[in-house]
Amino acid sequence: MLWRLVQQWSVAVFLLSYSVPSCGRSVEELGRRLKRAVSEHQLLHDKGKSIQDLRRRFFLHHLIAEIHTAEIRATSEVSPNSKPAPNTKNHPVRFGSDDEGKYLTQETNKVETYKEQPLKTPGKKKKSKPGKRKEQEKKKRRTRSAWLTSYVAGTGLEEDYLSDISATSLELNSRRH
Protein backbone atom coordinates (compact mmCIF):
# COMPACT_ATOMS: atom_id res chain seq x y z
CA MET A 1 0.00 0.00 0.00
CA LEU A 2 2.84 2.34 0.81
CA TRP A 3 4.47 1.49 -2.49
CA ARG A 4 1.30 2.44 -4.38
CA LEU A 5 1.03 5.76 -2.54
CA VAL A 6 4.65 6.61 -3.43
CA GLN A 7 4.00 5.84 -7.10
CA GLN A 8 0.95 8.13 -7.21
CA TRP A 9 2.86 10.94 -5.55
CA SER A 10 5.79 10.61 -7.91
CA VAL A 11 3.49 10.73 -10.95
CA ALA A 12 1.80 13.84 -9.54
CA VAL A 13 5.15 15.55 -8.90
CA PHE A 14 6.38 14.61 -12.38
CA LEU A 15 3.26 16.01 -14.03
CA LEU A 16 3.44 19.23 -12.05
CA SER A 17 7.14 19.82 -12.68
CA TYR A 18 7.17 18.92 -16.38
CA SER A 19 5.99 21.68 -18.74
CA VAL A 20 3.26 20.17 -20.86
CA PRO A 21 2.15 22.11 -23.92
CA SER A 22 -1.43 23.28 -23.63
CA CYS A 23 -3.24 24.42 -26.76
CA GLY A 24 0.05 24.55 -28.61
CA ARG A 25 1.79 26.57 -25.86
CA SER A 26 4.01 25.46 -23.07
CA VAL A 27 3.09 26.01 -19.42
CA GLU A 28 5.93 28.57 -19.14
CA GLU A 29 4.39 30.70 -21.89
CA LEU A 30 1.05 30.62 -20.10
CA GLY A 31 2.79 31.78 -16.92
CA ARG A 32 4.51 34.63 -18.80
CA ARG A 33 1.20 35.72 -20.20
CA LEU A 34 -0.11 36.38 -16.70
CA LYS A 35 2.91 38.53 -15.84
CA ARG A 36 2.25 41.82 -17.59
CA ALA A 37 4.07 45.08 -17.34
CA VAL A 38 2.41 48.11 -15.84
CA SER A 39 2.20 49.77 -19.25
CA GLU A 40 0.30 46.76 -20.60
CA HIS A 41 -2.15 46.98 -17.70
CA GLN A 42 -2.62 50.69 -18.34
CA LEU A 43 -3.14 50.05 -22.04
CA LEU A 44 -5.76 47.39 -21.37
CA HIS A 45 -7.45 49.61 -18.79
CA ASP A 46 -7.60 52.53 -21.23
CA LYS A 47 -8.88 50.25 -23.98
CA GLY A 48 -11.63 48.92 -21.72
CA LYS A 49 -12.52 52.44 -20.66
CA SER A 50 -12.75 53.64 -24.25
CA ILE A 51 -14.94 50.66 -25.20
CA GLN A 52 -17.22 51.39 -22.24
CA ASP A 53 -17.37 55.07 -23.23
CA LEU A 54 -18.19 54.13 -26.82
CA ARG A 55 -21.02 51.85 -25.65
CA ARG A 56 -22.34 54.64 -23.43
CA ARG A 57 -22.29 57.10 -26.34
CA PHE A 58 -24.15 54.67 -28.59
CA PHE A 59 -26.74 54.10 -25.87
CA LEU A 60 -27.25 57.83 -25.30
CA HIS A 61 -27.35 58.51 -29.05
CA HIS A 62 -30.03 55.84 -29.41
CA LEU A 63 -32.07 57.40 -26.58
CA ILE A 64 -31.74 60.89 -28.03
CA ALA A 65 -32.74 59.63 -31.46
CA GLU A 66 -35.91 58.17 -29.92
CA ILE A 67 -36.68 61.45 -28.19
CA HIS A 68 -36.20 63.54 -31.31
CA THR A 69 -38.22 61.22 -33.50
CA ALA A 70 -41.12 60.88 -31.05
CA GLU A 71 -44.50 61.81 -32.49
CA ILE A 72 -45.90 65.19 -31.58
CA ARG A 73 -49.25 64.80 -29.88
CA ALA A 74 -52.12 66.77 -31.30
CA THR A 75 -53.27 69.58 -28.99
CA SER A 76 -56.90 69.14 -30.06
CA GLU A 77 -57.17 65.82 -28.20
CA VAL A 78 -57.23 67.43 -24.76
CA SER A 79 -59.51 66.06 -22.08
CA PRO A 80 -62.05 68.58 -20.72
CA ASN A 81 -60.66 68.54 -17.14
CA SER A 82 -56.97 68.88 -17.96
CA LYS A 83 -55.02 72.08 -17.49
CA PRO A 84 -53.67 73.85 -20.56
CA ALA A 85 -49.96 73.63 -21.22
CA PRO A 86 -48.01 76.62 -19.88
CA ASN A 87 -46.91 77.69 -23.37
CA THR A 88 -50.47 77.77 -24.72
CA LYS A 89 -51.82 80.40 -22.30
CA ASN A 90 -53.25 83.49 -23.97
CA HIS A 91 -51.50 86.48 -22.43
CA PRO A 92 -52.36 90.02 -23.54
CA VAL A 93 -49.73 91.57 -25.76
CA ARG A 94 -49.31 94.73 -23.61
CA PHE A 95 -49.78 94.91 -19.86
CA GLY A 96 -49.82 98.63 -19.09
CA SER A 97 -50.75 101.94 -20.54
CA ASP A 98 -48.81 103.40 -23.44
CA ASP A 99 -47.16 106.12 -21.37
CA GLU A 100 -45.81 103.68 -18.80
CA GLY A 101 -42.30 103.63 -20.23
CA LYS A 102 -42.05 107.44 -20.37
CA TYR A 103 -41.80 107.93 -16.63
CA LEU A 104 -39.02 105.61 -15.64
CA THR A 105 -36.78 106.41 -12.70
CA GLN A 106 -33.75 106.07 -14.93
CA GLU A 107 -33.79 107.94 -18.19
CA THR A 108 -33.05 105.29 -20.78
CA ASN A 109 -34.39 107.04 -23.87
CA LYS A 110 -32.01 109.99 -23.95
CA VAL A 111 -31.67 111.75 -27.27
CA GLU A 112 -28.30 113.26 -26.40
CA THR A 113 -25.28 111.09 -26.94
CA TYR A 114 -22.86 110.47 -24.16
CA LYS A 115 -20.00 112.95 -24.22
CA GLU A 116 -16.71 111.55 -23.06
CA GLN A 117 -14.82 113.51 -20.48
CA PRO A 118 -11.35 114.62 -21.59
CA LEU A 119 -8.66 112.54 -19.95
CA LYS A 120 -6.40 114.27 -17.48
CA THR A 121 -2.81 114.47 -18.56
CA PRO A 122 -0.48 113.07 -15.95
CA GLY A 123 1.56 115.86 -14.43
CA LYS A 124 4.23 116.13 -11.81
CA LYS A 125 3.12 115.41 -8.32
CA LYS A 126 3.99 118.01 -5.75
CA LYS A 127 6.54 116.82 -3.28
CA SER A 128 5.76 117.82 0.25
CA LYS A 129 8.05 117.99 3.19
CA PRO A 130 7.70 114.95 5.44
CA GLY A 131 6.89 116.84 8.65
CA LYS A 132 4.70 119.53 7.11
CA ARG A 133 1.41 117.69 7.44
CA LYS A 134 2.05 116.77 11.04
CA GLU A 135 2.68 120.42 11.90
CA GLN A 136 -0.62 121.47 10.32
CA GLU A 137 -2.48 118.75 12.22
CA LYS A 138 -0.88 119.90 15.48
CA LYS A 139 -2.02 123.48 14.83
CA LYS A 140 -5.59 122.34 14.16
CA ARG A 141 -5.64 120.29 17.33
CA ARG A 142 -4.30 123.21 19.34
CA THR A 143 -7.00 125.51 18.03
CA ARG A 144 -9.76 122.96 18.71
CA SER A 145 -8.59 122.28 22.24
CA ALA A 146 -8.17 126.02 22.84
CA TRP A 147 -11.75 126.66 21.74
CA LEU A 148 -13.01 124.00 24.12
CA THR A 149 -10.98 125.23 27.08
CA SER A 150 -11.85 128.88 26.46
CA TYR A 151 -15.53 128.04 26.12
CA VAL A 152 -15.60 125.98 29.31
CA ALA A 153 -13.30 128.18 31.38
CA GLY A 154 -14.82 131.47 30.24
CA THR A 155 -11.48 133.26 30.26
CA GLY A 156 -10.90 136.07 27.80
CA LEU A 157 -8.60 134.06 25.53
CA GLU A 158 -11.05 133.78 22.64
CA GLU A 159 -9.58 136.73 20.76
CA ASP A 160 -6.04 135.31 20.76
CA TYR A 161 -7.24 131.97 19.45
CA LEU A 162 -9.48 133.59 16.86
CA SER A 163 -6.56 135.50 15.45
CA ASP A 164 -4.46 132.31 15.53
CA ILE A 165 -7.15 130.38 13.64
CA SER A 166 -7.60 133.10 11.03
CA ALA A 167 -3.84 133.18 10.47
CA THR A 168 -3.67 129.41 9.92
CA SER A 169 -6.69 129.48 7.60
CA LEU A 170 -5.08 132.27 5.58
CA GLU A 171 -1.88 130.21 5.30
CA LEU A 172 -3.83 127.19 4.07
CA ASN A 173 -5.78 129.22 1.52
CA SER A 174 -2.65 130.87 0.16
CA ARG A 175 -0.97 127.47 -0.27
CA ARG A 176 -3.92 126.01 -2.14
CA HIS A 177 -4.04 128.82 -4.70
UniProtKB/Swiss-Prot annotation:
The subcellular location is: Secreted; Cytoplasm; Nucleus
- In its UniProt entry, the species of origin is given as Bos taurus (Bovine)
Which N-terminal stretch is annotated as signal sequence?
A: 1-24
Q: Where is this motif: Nuclear localization signal?
A: 108-129
Tell me the subunit arrangement. Answer: PTHrP interacts with PTH1R (via N-terminal extracellular domain).
Q: Which gene encodes it?
A: PTHLH
Q: What is this protein called?
A: Parathyroid hormone-related protein
Q: What Pfam families does UniProt report for this protein, alphabetically?
A: Parathyroid
Could you tell me where the Polar residues compositional bias lies? 76-90
At the highest ranks, the source species' classification is: Eukaryota, Metazoa, Chordata, Craniata, Vertebrata
